[in-house]
From Swiss-Prot:
GO annotation terms (biological process): translation
Protein name: Small ribosomal subunit protein uS2c
Taxonomic source organism: Manihot esculenta
Record key words, sorted: Chloroplast, Plastid, Ribonucleoprotein, Ribosomal protein
Alphabetized InterPro entries for the sequence: Ribosomal_uS2, Ribosomal_uS2_bac/mit/plastid, Ribosomal_uS2_CS, Ribosomal_uS2_flav_dom_sf
Length: 236
């Protein structure tokens, strides 16, 4: 895999608050190599390590995108949800930004059935057929469609397991991470000072509680994905 330059700027990371970790009482000792200091009761992340692993992650997704691999971005907490959707749509990735429904990946056959039901209901609605049903039936199916849109809308075009999963907040998305580990799906995980850096294939130490920090890291990753897709188009 060729190493590339991704314009990862320390001043930009500082401005976004990437370096701010959790309180010193709320930390995982395994994060010690990724922490550079303590300041006013807060751990400070070593941005040199952040830049290194973010660069490695960008190289990985660029290479995967240039080979037409599929990506899933997962981030369901309120501070991450909007950034996850925007980043995924920009890079034509699948995403989950509401509740992670257990078994989305490990019970893929059930997920496929749900997705087919979702697609069928969308077609029925677009064709206006739901409005021709009795009011009770129409209301029930519309509620079902709204539920599927909320939780599966970001993966409605997914036809198989993803090749790489990008996870925002290891602790919040632990179920999704465990499913990836069970299936052997490579993961890139944004980790704060209270996380375990050994659980993902590439862990990027960062502030996973600040919108600006999450957005910056995701923007770098999706830029690399877009560049990789363009590389495939130029050199199929």
């Amino acid at each position: 895999m060729i190493r590339r330059y991704w314009n990862i700027n320390f001043e930009e990371m500082m401005k976004a608050g990437v370096h701010f970790g959790h309180g010193t009482r709320k930390w995982n000792p395994r994060m010690a190599p990724y922490i550079s200091a303590k300041r006013k009761g807060i751990h400070i992340t070593n941005l040199t390590r952040t830049a290194r692993f973010l660069s490695e992650a960008c190289d990985l997704v660029f290479d995967a995108a240039s080979r037409r691999k599929q990506f899933l971005i997962v981030g369901t907490k309120n501070k991450a949800a909007d950034s996850v959707a925007r980043a995924a749509i920009r890079a034509r990735c699948h995403y989950v930004n509401k509740k992670w429904l257990g078994g989305i990946l490990t019970n893929w056959s059930t997920t496929e059935t749900r997705l087919q039901k979702f697609r069928d209901l969308r077609m029925e609605q677009k064709a206006g057929r739901l409005n021709r049903l009795p009011k009770g039936d129409a209301a029930r199916l519309k509620r079902q469609l709204a539920h599927l849109q909320t939780y599966l809308g970001g993966i409605k075009y997914m036809t198989g397991l993803p090749d790489i999963v990008i996870i925002v907040d290891q602790q919040e998305e632990y179920t999704a991470l465990r499913e990836c580990m069970t299936l052997g799906i490579p993961t890139i995980c944004l980790i704060d000072t209270n996380c375990d850096p050994d659980l993902a294939d590439i862990s990027i130490p960062t502030n996973d509680d600040a919108i600006a920090s999450i957005r910056l890291i995701l923007n770098k990753l999706v830029f690399a994905i877009c560049e990789g897709r363009s590389s495939y188009i130029r050199n199929p």
